[in-house]
Amino acid sequence: MIYAKIIQMIIRFWGTRGSVPVCSPSVLKYGGDTTCVELRSKNNDLIVIDAGTGIRDLAVSLKNEKCPESFTMMFTHSHTDHIWGFPFFFPVYRKGQKINISCCNAPCGSGKEIVSGTMRPPIFPVKFENAAADFSFSTIPPEGTEIYGIKVTPVAISHPDGGSGFRFEENGRIFVFLTDNELKYNHKDSIGFEGYAEFCRNADLLVHDAQYNDEEYKMFRTWGHSTYSQVLELAEAAEVRHVCFFHHSPDRTDAEIDTIADSCNALLRTSGKRLSCSAVYKKQEIRL
């Protein structure tokens, strides 16, 4: 598919699952692949966020259109479910392809350390140094930067080993991406619930980790993930327009996710809030 020049920010989701990829008839709607998000600027410039197993299907999509000669990849952190698709991303092996890896200074490592670590024997036969693409590496400063005309502001996530969330602003539209962020426990570098609410303030779209329900969270507190109710609380406090649940538990079926999203929307309707919510599904496209 050839995408015409667009006039708005577009977000496509290629991997929505958390922790580990899953495959069964019960997860076909929301998908079993791990985190990978495609972001397009108003001029159709490409930013890829994370390289979980969903990145392979993004590669297929890029093959079906004219893959940009140059694009940017960003990583939230270096846990395996967010990086292990990188060696299977065809542009890595495309001669003349320009890929900029842009990351924050974080305990999880530099951009080069993250991607090169996925391509080394004995865990993968092709060394990163032998990849055909032309790589460059840049650091996103704490105050943010501009990528393809999009203002990108990072924030430290509350997660074991650290990492970053991002706020993207273009043409007055705001998209905030906070995966693997534990709202009710302060890991090292966490800015706390109120800090995250301010970071998300007035976002048109907030996509946030909601791996657990309240009962599960009692067992997995400190593991670096949030619950549906906590994310709704954050979205209300931040006065966002729409919130999407993300990083679905590998044990969660489509039917269970549907039930959670429906019950959360019913709760919002009775409260009279302008906020709406949904659960992100694989290959979903959102335009801002």
Model-derived regions: residue spans:
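Residues immediately flanking
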Residues: 51, 181, 210
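Active-site glycine-centered loops adjacent to acidic/histidine catalytic or metal-binding residues
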Residues: 77, 180, 247
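Binuclear metal-dependent hydrolase catalytic cores
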Residues: 1-176, 184-187, 196-197, 254-288
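Cap/insert and terminal regions of metallo-dependent hydrolase folds
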Residues: 185-274
